[in-house]
């Protein structure tokens, strides 16, 4: 499927699900398509995922402290809308082929601006945005990048008296103009998100540099480049800006190799230190042993007569808190994974889609059970789920993880 066709599919998906934020998952979406660059802010419609936490220490190794830090990080509305869109699509079975395309991004990472304004009462002619992108893996293909800046024009700014305003995004190193657009002054005093395409410069920077910081600079001009406007009048200043209204760099990537959920856990292990993880593992191990002792066997007796039920899909409810993963997983906190269980005995049913090898093995087992075990009841089809989580650098990440839900079972 060509990039344009995939983008059209995605646009229709957003429209169908009632999500109206721009979401370029492909290079064509962020650098080739000239769509509206001003996205209305969602305001109070944002779901409250985080809670204010006064202080917590990540290096303490304490699980509750790590959970408190996770709770203090609130995802931007944009990341929540991405998660909700694709989670809903997965439930409806709409985006399976969409994400299987080699062009599609399966990971979207948001980096929050760490820059500071120089002076409170001085004119703001240039605004620098700094992002720590050190957690971005080298084993990913960068498919798109955009800078999203929340702005609300000051009430003292008279748009009708100034004429069109052009805002320009520049490289901090070369000061070359990367992107520019005319500020939409209609309903200018309503809050909105301005979106800039930074895919080319970010890809070049990642290719030639291994630094941890990515820097961009913003300025605004009137009818010629010499007449710059104080950015504070246009609402680009940082003073009094809450965390959820800070600028974010959104990077769209696709992993060059399949990653498991344990990849993020390993990255956090490196950050937390081995001692704390050793204690956590021992604690979880004791908990698991006590659960095995206290809880009855779900599958009945392990010894004696075997179950006669045939291979089929059975419930398996996964709770990330019980796994100890709720210190980094934002959503979902639980989901239905299902599992496969039952006998693969002769004759094998066609709906189990047995392989030729499984058919032969099952036939041999029926003739001589003591010498040949039966074929195994395993997942024959799996589907992905969307996960919104916090990475080792405390960045909010959306990722679609493959092979998370059993759709059907078979004998292998």
Curated annotation (Swiss-Prot):
Induction: By shh. Residues 281-311 have a biased composition (Basic residues). SUPFAM superfamilies: Cystine-knot cytokines. SMART domains: TGFB. One of its GO terms (molecular function) is growth factor activity. GO terms for cellular component: extracellular space. Residues 1-21 form the signal peptide. Pfam families: TGF_beta, TGFb_propeptide. It is found in: Secreted. Residues 280-311 are annotated as: Disordered. CDD domains: TGF_beta_GDF5_6_7 (cd13766). Disulfide bonds join 311-377, 340-409, 344-411. Residues 22-287 form a propeptide. Expression is correlated temporally and spatially with somitogenesis. At late gastrula stage, expressed in the posterior presumptive neural plate. During somitogenesis, expression becomes restricted along the dorsoventral axis of the trunk neural tube in an anterior-to-posterior progression so that upon completion of somitogenesis, expression is seen exclusively in the ventral spinal cord with the exclusion of the floor plate and adjacent neural cells. Keywords: Cleavage on pair of basic residues, Disulfide bond, Glycoprotein, Growth factor, Secreted, Signal. Glycans are attached at residue 95. GO terms for biological process: BMP signaling pathway. Homodimer; disulfide-linked. Belongs to the TGF-beta family. This is Growth/differentiation factor 6-B. It comes from Danio rerio (Zebrafish).
């Amino acid at each position: 499927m060509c990039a344009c066709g995939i983008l059209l599919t995605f646009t229709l998906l957003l429209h169908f699900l009632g999500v109206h934020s721009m979401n370029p998952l492909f290079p064509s979406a962020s650098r080739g398509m000239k769509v509206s660059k001003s996205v209305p802010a969602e305001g109070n419609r944002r779901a409250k995922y985080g809670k204010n936490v006064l202080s917590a220490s990540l290096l303490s190794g304490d699980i509750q402290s790590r959970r408190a830090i996770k709770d203090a990080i609130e995802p931007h509305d944009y990341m929540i809308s991405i998660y909700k869109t694709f989670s809903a699509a997965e439930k409806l079975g709409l985006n399976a082929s969409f994400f299987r395309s080699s062009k599609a991004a399966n990971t979207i990472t948001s980096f929050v601006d760490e820059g500071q304004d120089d002076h409170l009462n001085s004119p703001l002619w240039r605004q620098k945005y700094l992002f720590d992108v050190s957690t971005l893996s080298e084993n990913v293909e960068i498919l798109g990048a955009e800078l999203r800046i929340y702005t609300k024009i000051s009430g003292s700014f008279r748009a009708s008296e100034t004429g069109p305003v052009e805002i320009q995004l520049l490289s901090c190193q070369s000061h070359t103009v990367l992107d520019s657009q005319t500020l939409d002054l209609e309903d200018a005093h309503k809050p909105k998100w301005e979106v800039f395409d930074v895919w080319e410069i970010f890809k070049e920077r990642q290719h030639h540099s291994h630094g941890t910081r990515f820097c961009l600079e913003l300025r605004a001009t009137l009818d010629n480049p010499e007449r710059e406007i104080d950015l504070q009048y246009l609402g680009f200043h940082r003073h009094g800006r809450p965390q959820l209204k800070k600028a974010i760099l959104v990077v769209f990537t696709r992993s060059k190799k399949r990653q498991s959920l344990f990849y993020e856990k390993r990255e956090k292990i490196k950050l937390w230190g081995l001692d704390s993880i050793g204690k956590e593992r021992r604690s979880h191990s004791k908990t698991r042993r006590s659960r095995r002792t206290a809880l009855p066997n779900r599958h009945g007796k392990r010894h004696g007569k075997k179950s006669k039920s045939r291979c089929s899909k059975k419930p398996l409810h996964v709770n990330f808190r019980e796994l100890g993963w709720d210190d980094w997983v934002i959503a979902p906190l639980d989901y239905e994974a299902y599992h496969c269980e039952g006998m693969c005995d002769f004759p094998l049913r066609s709906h189990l889609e047995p392989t030729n090898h499984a058919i032969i093995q099952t036939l041999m087992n029926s003739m001589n059970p003591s010498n040949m075990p039966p074929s195994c009841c395993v997942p024959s089809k799996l589907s992905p789920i969307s996960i919104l989580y916090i990475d080792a650098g405390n960045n909010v990440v959306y990722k679609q993880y493959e092979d998370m839900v059993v759709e059907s079972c078979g004998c292998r």
